[in-house]
């Protein structure tokens, strides 16, 4: 059997090919039909037990789900783009989650590794300096691009699946590989948590590449994610002739505008950082019509769950107050959510020990003082910890061609080998008799 590092280096060209295929056929949240089908096919061929679709994703817990027409069109596109049929049907309707399980048959705990699969709603750059365009693997799906590295994450998950099967005789306990849909907008993890996919997990690790961490650095316990609530506010008023009978109208546009201004005046919290943002406002049908409908797309964030809850509750008060001022009604619809991150110190220490063994890792650290957004893997972390398990979130530094969520985003694909080796060592070196 080859040495682990040698085997992974031999696997890297294939991982790169997988990554570039996924990049070319980018699919955004809840429509990762081709992506999930390709992943499931390969995991099945490796001999993993698979939990798919509705068994891995709770229907009622999905957030920010596209409409039925969008889902149907994306499903048909995936079929036309080569999604393997035996697997494609399992994901129809927006149930694009996968859990691959390797039961060694030997005593030991359950370890889980989570990667995300979705792309962003973004048009990829077509400049000749952009490597994916230059080398002909830029996204062929309009308005969808892997601009955050999730194509790399998925390839890392598949690479890890290959390695664990190759070295299965050295493993103990149960290994679960979680391929999550719809991380962007923090929409997908809650539905997989509700389906119970991490309820039996003793040790949990989620990963990301890049995020401003320099190449050669591995962060083993990222703890700077903010709790967040993402929601739509739908205002309903009464349409009327703006010149003839304006008093008969109830102006939903003005209610939404009042709310948008007032939301940004919510007082900060003394216990830590908070954020609120109105990213979209849509209203009106014509200049001579009192608008009867309006939409705000809003998000709140907090350094802790309590701070985010404070901001969200104040936001709800502001929105309902603005609606009342103009005689309108308003409905709030939850579109995404995540909690703050609190990695388990003992697990972070163990992960740091494994990362430090990997060639190409110059420093393995517990945390890094840098601002972060939000990440719904924190919901999986929290559930594992609620069940007395340990959890953490790792970031593998790499050189980026542009920042995350930018149309020129790309990364150094060598980071995938570093990530796979670190995660493989995490399973292979686990002290199963005493735990961490």
From Swiss-Prot:
User: Which stretches are transmembrane?
Assistant: none
Q: Does the keyword Hydrolase apply?
A: yes
Q: How does activity depend on pH?
A: Optimum pH is 8-8.5.
Gene Ontology cellular-component annotations: cytoplasm
Instruction: Tell me what reaction this enzyme catalyses.
Output: (indol-3-yl)acetyl-L-aspartate + H2O = (indol-3-yl)acetate + L-aspartate
Picking any one GO biological process from the record gives: folic acid catabolic process
Task: Please give the superkingdom of this protein's source.
Answer: Bacteria
Q: Name one GO molecular function term.
A: dipeptidase activity
Which InterPro entries does its entry note?
A: AbgA (IPR033845), Amidohydrolase (IPR017439), Bact_exopeptidase_dim_dom (IPR036264), Peptidase_M20 (IPR002933), Peptidase_M20/M20A_hydrolases (IPR052030), Peptidase_M20_dimer (IPR011650)
Which keywords annotate this record? Hydrolase
Quaternary structure and interacting proteins, as annotated: Monomer.
Q: What does this protein do?
A: Hydrolyzes indole-3-acetyl-aspartate (IAA-Asp) to indole-3-acetic acid (IAA). Shows an exclusively high substrate specificity for IAA-Asp.
Family from the record: Belongs to the peptidase M20 family.
Name-wise, this protein is Indole-3-acetyl-aspartic acid hydrolase
Species this protein is from:
Enterobacter agglomerans (Erwinia herbicola)
